[in-house]
């Protein structure tokens, strides 16, 4: 471990200006600064233009904003976050981002671009036929691969030194999967020299991140003003719980994150499996189910007995046996997660959590389906989750969802065509992008059809 760096301060460049980064990674760096350790600061950037208003607001506030956290009992705390010292302007060519990323003082580049932002198929290879990937292979910067490859190419040319690439999304083996996608991207471009440089001059540790961070509500700025006296046009909110587990494999130094509560480990595997399967998959289950019966918020859906029972049964009957033995108390973790979801003060929306289902099923749910069959069992409880998503997307197809569904890899024409076919459930069950080897399994297809019927019947009696 090498945390001691001489001045000038090292820069942690983060790509992805959403609320989660500002409530999570930026908080840890802020706590280090508040403790007197000023060796690292953050530069914040975005790949797409949708964050321009936020970046402009943060720049006007000198990168400062207030984080509101709330406990399940309703206790709120407010903290002004000061770790964002450079807000990078967006430009279409990402020249400003590349300029910061290629500086020698930039020692870590982290990113949050959502699960779908890595464009990986169910074999975790790059989706070469995706239009954004194709554009980046031709030289654009629409994806994390296009942006990072430009930065690294400039670092190679400028001899700026090694850099750590840190994936902070809910992707299993997130560092390894990103690195595989990046190297495949460079190979497809024929950039062998850069590929060799990346292999020797970068590291990509796996991480596990956790803090429920809803989109800021309309009234948070007023609460911040009343409680702190600060006029903040870019506040964020989150639950009081926070966790960050990181494999300690940094090539160019790192902040002393263990001093502010991060867990530096040799392997994140047991942590990430528990989090992805228990927290993330249950979250999606609850959001899809709640949306189908007209509920808006995660807490009200979690407090609905039938929905809570679906999530509880999924974890208890199928996930815990799949992950046992584990160094974690999985039953306790299940109960803590459901308590966190029940927090009425977070007001996290089903719309936010229901998003990106086409990435979440293969990433969060299918591994448990497969392992249940491998143990000789039948994943009756787990099959309810993709069944919920099927009925959820059927509602989307019919135009009856109460909100706009957001999914980075959604193919609207293909989904509409599926539901217009003579056998939508069969096409869904045989989708190898969602279910991998189970897409050719008649037993699984029969189970999924039964589960879809169960969900449809439940929705019809509870809507």
UniProtKB/Swiss-Prot annotation:
<dbReference type="InterPro" id="IPR000669">
    <property type="entry name" value="Mannitol_DH"/>
</dbReference>
<dbReference type="InterPro" id="IPR050025">
    <property type="entry name" value="DalD"/>
</dbReference>
<dbReference type="InterPro" id="IPR008927">
    <property type="entry name" value="6-PGluconate_DH-like_C_sf"/>
</dbReference>
<dbReference type="GO" id="GO:0047813">
    <property type="term" value="F:D-arabinitol 4-dehydrogenase activity"/>
</dbReference>
<keyword id="KW-0560">Oxidoreductase</keyword>
<dbReference type="GO" id="GO:0042840">
    <property type="term" value="P:D-glucuronate catabolic process"/>
</dbReference>
<keyword id="KW-0520">NAD</keyword>
<dbReference type="GO" id="GO:0008866">
    <property type="term" value="F:fructuronate reductase activity"/>
</dbReference>
<dbReference type="InterPro" id="IPR036291">
    <property type="entry name" value="NAD(P)-bd_dom_sf"/>
</dbReference>
<comment type="pathway">
    <text>Carbohydrate metabolism; D-arabinitol metabolism.</text>
</comment>
<dbReference type="InterPro" id="IPR013118">
    <property type="entry name" value="Mannitol_DH_C"/>
</dbReference>
<dbReference type="InterPro" id="IPR050988">
    <property type="entry name" value="Mannitol_DH/Oxidoreductase"/>
</dbReference>
<dbReference type="GO" id="GO:0051161">
    <property type="term" value="P:arabitol metabolic process"/>
</dbReference>
<dbReference type="InterPro" id="IPR013328">
    <property type="entry name" value="6PGD_dom2"/>
</dbReference>
<dbReference type="InterPro" id="IPR013131">
    <property type="entry name" value="Mannitol_DH_N"/>
</dbReference>
<dbReference type="Pfam" id="PF08125">
    <property type="entry name" value="Mannitol_dh_C"/>
</dbReference>
<dbReference type="Pfam" id="PF01232">
    <property type="entry name" value="Mannitol_dh"/>
</dbReference>
<protein>
    <recommendedName>
        <fullName>D-arabinitol 4-dehydrogenase</fullName>
        <ecNumber>1.1.1.11</ecNumber>
    </recommendedName>
</protein>
<comment type="similarity">
    <text>Belongs to the mannitol dehydrogenase family.</text>
</comment>
